[in-house]
């Protein structure tokens, strides 16, 4: 019986892992571009209509204790998500050996500077109660974005790379579905998260979406690393 429960927990953890992916990669046919002097990170744009706040009882309680309008709340959420992505991208790109800094939208790059920008197509906080109780994708929180990489040339700013990036909370079964095994699996997940935090691999954010933005930055950085290596900018 113990072995069966162990197998169930391992299976649930494997199936329920958060999904992070990149698709629709479009690369301009350019090789051996000059090494960038800096990489400029600009805030990703997001429309208010593309933001879905936390739904269900939890969302109502959270909204009820705030005197602010839904639009202001959406603005706070988008600011945290954008800030999380900026912070993580700067750290990860700098770790690759290229200077990366955050700049305002109106800052114009100089020759051989690279710009990374884009747009969040969807920011969905999901339903935390359904996610924890039912799981299997119910109440899932998710992010969808379009990433655009530009280069400053004597002829102007040109796009050199673009792709879509997605992150979600996964399909982990909730406590009601898993029963006793759910409690054990939840504890196992907590241990994994705890280890990551202890290693300094995680930053605490208020929203699910901001935490996913941090994970999204990992995947975006992977695509950037491949491109940088192809150009000979890094080894």
State where each predicted segment sits.
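Surface-exposed short loop/turn segments
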Residues: 105-180
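Sec-dependent signal peptide recognition
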Residues: 2-10
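Transition segments tied to proteolytic processing and entry into folded domains
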Residues: 87-90, 95, 105-106
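Generic signature of mature, soluble extracytoplasmic domains
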Residues: 91-99, 150-152
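Surface-exposed patches in mature extracellular/periplasmic domains of secreted proteins
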Residues: 97-107, 231-235
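A structural "domain/chain start" motif
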Residues: 17-91, 161-166, 179, 190-235
């Amino acid at each position: 019986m113990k072995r069966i429960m162990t197998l169930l927990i391992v299976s649930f953890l494997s199936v329920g892992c958060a999904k992070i992916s990149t698709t629709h990669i479009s690369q301009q046919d350019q090789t051996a571009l000059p090494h960038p002097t800096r990489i400029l990170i600009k805030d990703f744009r997001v429309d208010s209509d593309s933001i879905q706040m936390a739904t269900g009882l939890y969302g109502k309680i959270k909204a009820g204790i705030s005197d602010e309008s839904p639009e202001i709340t959406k603005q706070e959420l988008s600011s945290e998500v954008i800030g999380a992505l900026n912070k993580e991208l700067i750290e990860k790109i700098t770790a690759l050996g290229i200077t990366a800094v955050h700049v305002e939208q109106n800052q114009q790059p100089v020759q051989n500077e690279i710009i990374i920008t884009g747009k969040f197509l969807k920011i969905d906080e999901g339903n935390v109660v359904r996610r924890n109780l039912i799981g299997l994708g119910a109440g899932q929180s998710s992010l969808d974005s379009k990433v655009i990489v530009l280069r400053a040339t004597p002829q102007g700013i040109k796009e050199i790379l673009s792709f879509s990036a997605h992150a979600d909370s996964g399909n982990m079964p909730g406590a009601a579905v898993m029963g006793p095994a759910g409690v054990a699996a939840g504890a196992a997940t907590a241990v994994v998260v705890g280890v990551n935090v202890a290693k300094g691999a995680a930053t605490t954010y208020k929203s699910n979406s901001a935490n996913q933005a941090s994970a999204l930055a990992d995947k975006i950085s992977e695509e950037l690393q491949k491109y940088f290596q192809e150009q000979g900018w890094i080894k």
